[in-house]
Amino acid sequence: MKKYVYMFPEGNGKMRELLGGKGANLAEMTGLGMPVPQGFTITTEACTRYYEDGKTIYPDIQDQILLYLDQLEKITGKTLGDPEKPLLVSVRSGARASMPGRMDTILNLGMNDEICEAVAKLTNNPRFARDSYRRFIQMFSDVVMELPKSSFEQFIDQVKDKKGVKLDNELDADDMSELIVLFKDHYKKSLGEDFPQDPKKQLMEAVRAVFRSWDNPRANTYRRMNDIPHSWGTAVNVQSMVFGNMGETSGTGVAFTRNPATGEKKLYGEFLMNAQGEDVVAGIRTPQPISALADTMPEVYQQFVDISSRLEKHYGDMQDMEFTIENGKLYMLQTRNGKRTAQAALKVAVDLVDEGVCTKEQAVMKVEAKQLDALLHPTFDPAALKAATPITTGLPASPGAACGAVYFTADDAAKAHKTGIKAVLVRQETSPEDIDGMAVSEGIMTARGGMTSHAAVVARGMGTCCVAGVNGIKVSEEDKTLTFADGTVVHEGDIISLDGSTGNVYLGAIATQEAELTGDFGRFMGWADEIRTLHVRTNGDTPRDATQARKFGAEGIGLCRTEHMFFEPARIKAVREMIISDTLEQRKAALAKILPMQRGDFEAIYRAMGGLPVTIRLLDPPLHEFLPHEDDEIKELADEMGVSFDKLKGKVESLHEFNPMLGTRGCRLDVLYPEIAEMQTEAIVSAAINVWKEDGLHITPEIMVPLVSEVNELRFVKKVIKAKADELIEQSGLKMKYMVGTMIETPRAAVTAGDVAKEAEFFSFGTNDLTQMTYGFSRDDVGRILETYFDKKILESDPFARLDQNGVGRLIRFAVAEGKRTRPDIKLGICGEHGGDLSSVEFCHNVGLNYVSCSPFRVPIARLAAAQARVKELGLA
């Protein structure tokens, strides 16, 4: 029989795929002899089978769960549902990739009316027992029965108001009894049934709920954001409870071995006495810094410091740990590699190498490539910041600078983002349901919560600026107002600025400045460049793009789109003259006006790149894109160009196509109008000649013909290019070389790549169009169906954002092999937006491409992703 359940001592840290990250680490800590409450893990395979079996836990798996429950009961000497020696357990999810706050947890399972009173007598602590029971009712109702946790808060507030207290821990045993009655009554009125009293039924329902939570909206959103496949599933950890809410010698906390915001080598975290785990992250009470534990419980603190040091050394990385103290005894509930900001990730990686803890190869694996994005964007201008006065200060939960319009709900922030408005999400406290709005916000501010609250952890993971726990503010979601302590009121849509590095909050917008990449960044990226074999170029159309990309380490331009230069007001007129020309002579006259403009552009780009390779694509879009379509715009242009309205309108209509993206564009334009290819070739080659002569930069122009489907198209256009290029080079007296290649962006070009390589000296895979044509999706319209496809598990990711390796990737593999067979020295690259996607970069490395090309700000990301792909290939991670 297949094994679906493992006791903690049966596992180890290498079993992440089966036991999930939490289960594997609990097993590893158990093996290291650390104080871990005993338990068992239900595997990820049980979760995937749950979905395969129509969201059912089949009897064979249920039997194994009960068998291992029996083992746990023997180990602990306690029994689930036994009032004399009651066992209470926690039920927690644990995927192989960390998903903090995205799935569901239940504490104190096994509680019922009888057990509650038994625990009260056994512990001589009725308040603790009843507090644990009311928490369980609330969590079980939320996670298992989908009765919102927030719907119970009104009863807590009601009892606190009646008693005249502000904090939950000021309620006594009688108050807890009252809450239990209110909670159970609310449960029955809402669901039409009594709260379940059978602990084994509670357990099975809880396991089912954790499996179900793998597919809840916030988990799905997080998985899509972090490239975690649905097929992985989650494990479930069932662990004997230890209690931080038994009194003033009990407590709970979360800590990191280093500061997750800065990377400083110093124990960092928070704890609460007389509390359970969710109290710390929920932000309901303000926790104490971990250093204060040294005064409160010095022996426990020293034991925790020693364990923290051992764990970091063992895992070779910064650890994020959860712990509970029960009646003065320390228990470790979790350890995992800690989520951290980009700045912290760099510092930790560099410091670990300097400390001799890890190698350079291991260090480059400790920074998520996409995190670098947070380092490449502007920060507040120091002069502007100095002139500004903060209206309040909170906790600097996640660094960075954010400026935007205030919104009070995640939905409103998401709607604002869709209309192009930069939003700052302001909440009393965030919850996992806010993930969609948090993901698109420039910054996040909360009234409650500490440095390990939900808002802080999620913001750091996303690289989003966050200021948490801002005391003295009043957030009214209903009135859509934010009131500061001095009485200042900010309404929805008003602008505020957040400094996540200091916790300062400012009214209005503060000027920003470009990021500076020095210090740890330079060293770290130097290691990445030493390791990687895949080159990284940029997609750039202007000298500014080129300069920015070189600053970020680009090794050339993989795609320069010539048409983007045509839309400037001074040039568009000449382009339009060329389009409406009736004769070849008229068209050539118009092209002669465009030639010096294009040549000047290319000279500036060549100079900016300092002799690095530059691939220039010939004109690609259909001609109608350069003409107006509304009658009033056509009339205005006709008057400006001195032609009749009817003539111009007729030309516009003649160029109209039902499916222009599959119409007269790319190389088809050059076949119909060879003079366009001739003019562009002259601009490209003459610019290279001028820069060679004037600056001494030996340029090898790379001329790329777009949208080839048939080798004869390329052969025809190449003949036009060669005739003009050879003529210009001969006249120059230089021994300049050039290359002619093509974009592989149609399926036919991919499957006939062996023939195409007879004419092409290089291939650049245009994966945007190749994806569009392989799927038959319109890139501009596919968004309408993607959410439905995600929800129905038809697709796991957007194929225009992450390369489809099974379909489009198979075409690329085939084209690479066929191209190399025909021309062994063919140069191979990719220039679609996939060039900056992590998994796509790894794919490009593995299939043997020479380079990837991406937007300037994604160049460092691609450099690191290429290094990580190489480390994986060498098995040095």
Regions found by a protein language model. Give the residues of each.
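Short beta->alpha connector loops at strand-helix junctions that form conserved
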Residues: F40, A447-G449, A468-N471, C560, ...
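Short alpha-helix capping/helix-loop boundary micro-motifs
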Residues: R310, K480-D486
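Short, compositionally biased
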Residues: G356, Y506-M525
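Residues forming the flavin
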Residues: M462-T464
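Nucleotide/phosphate-binding sheet-loop regions of phosphoryl- and nucleotidyl-transfer enzymes
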Residues: M1-A388, D411-K415, I421-V424, S431-D436, ...
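Conserved alpha/beta-domain cores
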Residues: R92, L517-G519, W527-A877
